[in-house]
């Protein structure tokens, strides 16, 4: 059960004691356009978050006034979507930057506690078949129930001695594994892997591998790019296609896998704290991991509320560390190779 958290107002000396909860900012006092421009989400979505997280963000206190759940959520959304603790953001809702930082921490933890509620694979056969049908309708790739990729998110250096977070560009990052469906809804998110790990190593160590190797629906698989090794449950493109059927397979694979690429671009465009445009996340790796996951939870909640995942303008490919030559090598999984060749022969010849 989530433990309710109270954020005490750091500006108490400026405003004195009085009512137990501070409500300097009222949603009803501003326009929908203002909320979208400042916080990135519409009014009804924010009201839903207040209802969802309110119990975790509030608790009666006799000692001082607590910042309301509504204000805490606005502070967090402002940070997630802008990537910085701007003075104007705190001024808009009437709190200091120090209070904003605490609000972000508490809202982040409240969202992380609910991650499994909003990020998960479907379990019933009808839902799995629906995934297959939708992906097949996109580019003719059969049996696909999700598309996988990794994305690096820049973080500050944990300490001078720890090189595990240094990626191939010489920058500190977390390498995050993500799987989505055709709508861009996230079904698996792992955000704690250090940036020095290659994508194939992240996948090997992930819970996703144990989940799919212990059991998955028959004739079902994920699609991954050439940074992953071919597996019996994860199909990759052919490094050197030779026949017409192999070229058709690669084209269908690329068109289908582009869903996760667009989803990650949109995620970083909506949540600018992830794209590095305002600098690396200035927290410990664990807190950075939680912030990334919180943004992913918000992404899925927004889809559940009818917001279009593709509505945000996407500037272009995400700047990521280069792939190593070894990442284009095929694995020696003979069973996986047999499955892929059989698929090509059956569906693309």
Swiss-Prot record:
User: Which tissues does the record link to its expression?
Assistant: Detected in adult brain, eye, nerve tissue and lung. Detected in embryo.
Entry's EC annotation: 3.1.-.-
Residues covered by the DDE Tnp4 domain = 149-300
The record ties this protein, via InterPro entries, to:
HARBI1-like, HARBI1_animal, HARBI1_dom
Q: Which GO terms describe its cellular component?
A: centriolar satellite; cytosol; nucleus; plasma membrane
UniProt keywords (A-Z) are: Cytoplasm, Hydrolase, Metal-binding, Nuclease, Nucleus
Q: Which cofactor does it need?
A: a divalent metal cation
The molecule here is called: Putative nuclease HARBI1
Q: Whose protein is this, by species?
A: Mus musculus
């Amino acid at each position: 059960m989530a433990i309710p958290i109270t954020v005490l107002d750091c500006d108490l000396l400026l405003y004195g004691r009085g009512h137990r909860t501070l409500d300097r900012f009222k949603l009803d006092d501003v326009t929908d356009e203002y909320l979208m421009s400042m916080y990135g989400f519409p009014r009804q979505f924010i009201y839903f978050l207040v209802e969802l997280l309110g119990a975790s963000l509030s608790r009666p206190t006799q000692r001082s006034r607590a910042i309301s759940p509504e204000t805490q959520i606005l502070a967090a959304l402002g940070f997630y979507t802008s990537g910085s603790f701007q003075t104007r953001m705190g001024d808009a809702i009437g709190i200091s930057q120090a209070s904003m930082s605490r609000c972000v921490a508490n809202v982040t933890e409240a969202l992380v506690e609910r991650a499994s509620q909003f990020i998960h694979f479907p379990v019933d056969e009808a839902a799995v078949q629906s995934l297959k049908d939708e992906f097949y309708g996109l580019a003719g790739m059969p049996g696909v129930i999700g598309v996988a990729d990794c994305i690096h998110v820049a973080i500050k250096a944990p300490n001078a001695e720890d090189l595990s977070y240094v990626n191939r560009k010489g920058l500190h990052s977390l390498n995050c594994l993500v799987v989505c469906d055709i709508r861009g809804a996230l079904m698996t998110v792992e955000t704690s892997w250090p940036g020095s790990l290659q994508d194939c190593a992240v996948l090997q160590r992930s819970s996703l591998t144990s989940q799919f190797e212990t059991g998955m629906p028959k004739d079902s698989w994920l699609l991954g790019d050439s940074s992953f090794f071919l597996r019996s449950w994860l199909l990759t493109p052919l490094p050197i296609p030779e026949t017409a059927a192999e070229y058709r397979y690669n084209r269908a694979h690329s068109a289908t896998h582009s869903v996760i690429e667009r989803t990650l671009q949109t995620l970083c465009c909506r949540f600018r704290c992830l794209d590095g445009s305002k600098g690396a996340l200035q927290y410990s790796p664990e807190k950075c991991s939680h912030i990334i996951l919180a943004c992913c939870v918000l992404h899925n909640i927004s889809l559940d509320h009818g917001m279009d995942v593709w509505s945000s303008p996407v500037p272009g490919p995400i700047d990521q560390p280069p792939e190593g030559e070894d990442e284009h090598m095929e694995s020696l999984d003979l069973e996986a190779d047999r499955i892929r060749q059989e698929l090509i022969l059956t569906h693309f010849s």
